[in-house]
Amino acid sequence: MKKIKEAEQRKLRRKKRIKDKIGRGVASRPRITIFKSNRYFYAQVIDDSRGHTVVSISTIEKSLNLSKNIDDIKKLGEVLAKRLKEKNINNLIFDRNGYKYHGLIASFATSLREFGINI
């Protein structure tokens, strides 16, 4: 039990440190935030100045039919990049939400970069 609490506290400290460094997203450069559950992967692009979600995507969408593995997360990044291009958004602030930058998070960010989104 103690190890779980310590891990949670470390994640919260990482999350706060990241938020302090990246700041807030604006209309010209919105913030993309990530959330992982045990089963699904979610990403949403947020304009913090208006408090609105500009674009969101997840593996739970029926039309995508994706699971939570690295290959499908790369496809998710590709689809999100296309949706962002439709809305003329090319620059983002990447908020990894306290998660370590490896595995799914890293492959998602790399996929966005490969399809022309500046992070």
From Swiss-Prot:
One GO BP annotation of this record: translation
Keyword terms: Ribonucleoprotein, Ribosomal protein, RNA-binding, rRNA-binding
Cysteines engaged in disulfide bonds, as pairs: none
Ranges of biased composition (kind: Basic and acidic residues): 1-10
Signal peptide: none
Keyword hit for Ribosomal protein: yes
Origin species: Borrelia garinii subsp. bavariensis (strain ATCC BAA-2496 / DSM 23469 / PBi)
Origin organism lineage: Bacteria, Pseudomonadati, Spirochaetota, Spirochaetia, Spirochaetales
Protein name (record): Large ribosomal subunit protein uL18
Superkingdom of source: Bacteria
GO cellular component: cytoplasm; ribonucleoprotein complex; ribosome
A GO term for molecular function: 5S rRNA binding
Recorded family membership: Belongs to the universal ribosomal protein uL18 family.
Role played: This is one of the proteins that bind and probably mediate the attachment of the 5S RNA into the large ribosomal subunit, where it forms part of the central protuberance.
